């Protein structure tokens, strides 16, 4: 059993080399691992037979398609709500504001999880509720980190309707807010979905480094004071990064 475990460890060490180089020859694998050529040849032959490695016409090895299959299975089975909830609960305890998780659904955002703080205010947001991508910090944290051409196409085809007194309805101003969000790594909104409320949102990225969701804190506008904003923004950004890493972002 111990010898089998050693073989597994050595095989993993060999496979890890392909994280840094797309293809490697047998000689390169021997040089990088420091293992005997016969041992390396035996391992790569077994890994190739099982589909973990593939070999091209020149004899160089690369990761096999089985990794793509496994990777897709892992991605499909990740429940972002389940992963995010403990982080959201901790964030709520720290800032004592409502914490929300939002995901994109076409040209809208849908609230998929929410943790209430101790404040008596009950906001516009609720699980299952929708908002346009341009309005509110949480939704805009998703819009801001989409590919630029997709953002511009969205703004061009979307009528920016006022929802609250602070909703951004000017396309140029919206683009400016998006640029600021990208630069800062977070989005702030005041009275965009509901008057006298404020929110700070940050993007959550997946294993493909694409925006997968957004997390925000929201509450009374009066509680989002200028001197408190730096603390709140760092907390939201940190929570977003924690969740991103848990779903494969590197």
UniProtKB/Swiss-Prot annotation:
SMART domains: HTH_ICLR. The keyword DNA-binding applies. Residues 26-45 bind DNA. GO terms for biological process: negative regulation of DNA-templated transcription. Induction: Induced by glucose when readily available sources of nitrogen, such as ammonia or glutamine, are scarce. Gene3D superfamilies: 3.30.450.40, Winged helix-like DNA-binding domain superfamily/Winged helix DNA-binding domain. Residues 5-65 form the HTH iclR-type domain. Keywords: DNA-binding, Repressor, Transcription, Transcription regulation. GO terms for molecular function: DNA binding; DNA-binding transcription factor activity. It comes from the Bacteria. It holds the Pfam family HTH_IclR. Residues 80-249 form the IclR-ED domain. InterPro entries: GAF-like_dom_sf, HTH_MetabolicPath_Reg, Tscrpt_reg_IclR_C, Tscrpt_reg_IclR_N, WH-like_DNA-bd_sf, WH_DNA-bd_sf. PROSITE patterns: HTH_ICLR, ICLR_ED. Coiled coil: none annotated. Transcriptional repressor of the kip gene-containing operon. This is HTH-type transcriptional regulator KipR. It comes from Bacillus subtilis (strain 168). The lineage of its organism: Bacteria, Bacillati, Bacillota, Bacilli, Bacillales.
């Amino acid at each position: 059993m111990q010898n089998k475990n050693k073989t597994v460890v050595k095989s993993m060490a060999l496979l890890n080399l392909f994280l840094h180089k797309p293809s490697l020859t047998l000689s390169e694998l021997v040089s990088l691992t420091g293992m005997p050529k016969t041992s390396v040849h035996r391992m790569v032959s077994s890994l190739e037979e099982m589909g973990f490695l593939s070999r091209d016409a020149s004899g160089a090895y690369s990761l096999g398609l089985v990794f793509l299959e496994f990777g897709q299975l892992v991605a499909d089975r990740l429940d972002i709500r389940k992963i995010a909830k403990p982080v959201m609960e901790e964030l709520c305890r720290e800032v004592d504001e409502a914490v929300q998780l939002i995901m994109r659904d076409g040209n809208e955002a849908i609230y998929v999880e929410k943790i209430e703080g101790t404040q008596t205010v009950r906001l516009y947001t609720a699980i299952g509720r929708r908002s346009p991508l341009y309005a509110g910090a949480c939704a805009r944290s998703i819009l801001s980190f989409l590919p630029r051409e997709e953002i511009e196409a969205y703004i061009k085809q979307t009528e920016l309707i006022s929802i609250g007194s602070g909703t951004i309805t000017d396309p140029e101003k919206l683009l400016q807010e998006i640029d600021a969000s990208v630069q800062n790594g977070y989005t702030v909104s005041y009275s965009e979905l509901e008057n006298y409320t404020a929110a700070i949102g940050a993007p959550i990225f997946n294993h493909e480094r694409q925006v997968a969701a957004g997390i925000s804190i929201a509450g009374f506008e009066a509680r989002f004071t200028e001197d408190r904003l730096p603390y709140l923004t760092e907390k939201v950004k940190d929570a977003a990064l924690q969740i991103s890493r848990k779903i494969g972002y590197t």
